[in-house]
């Protein structure tokens, strides 16, 4: 069984109170709340590795491309896709 409180704890915004009650976010059609690990990773990428993928020949672009393709490979394996090219962000 899922521990709802543990899952909620991964999403910083969900610790917010609205009118003295815990926030319940039901507008996922417009955007989705991000867990702390996503927020931290995006923050790191913007601070340390902000470059275009598949376009540059400098170190930052090459590392960004490697990380992008590694993410596609992980998602490909998770969803059972045959090829990384089937994973599109």
Describe the residue ranges of each PLM region.
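Pyridoxal 5′-phosphate
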Residues: 1-89
């Amino acid at each position: 069984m899922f521990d709802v409180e543990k899952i909620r704890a991964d999403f910083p915004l969900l610790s917010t109170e609205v009118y003295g009650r815990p926030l319940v976010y039901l507008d996922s059609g417009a955007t989705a709340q991000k867990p702390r690990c996503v927020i931290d990773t995006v923050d790191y990428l913007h601070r340390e590795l902000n470059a275009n993928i598949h376009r540059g020949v400098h170190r930052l672009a090459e590392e960004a491309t490697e990380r992008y393709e590694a993410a596609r490979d992980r998602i490909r394996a998770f969803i059972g896709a045959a090829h990384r090219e089937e994973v599109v962000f």
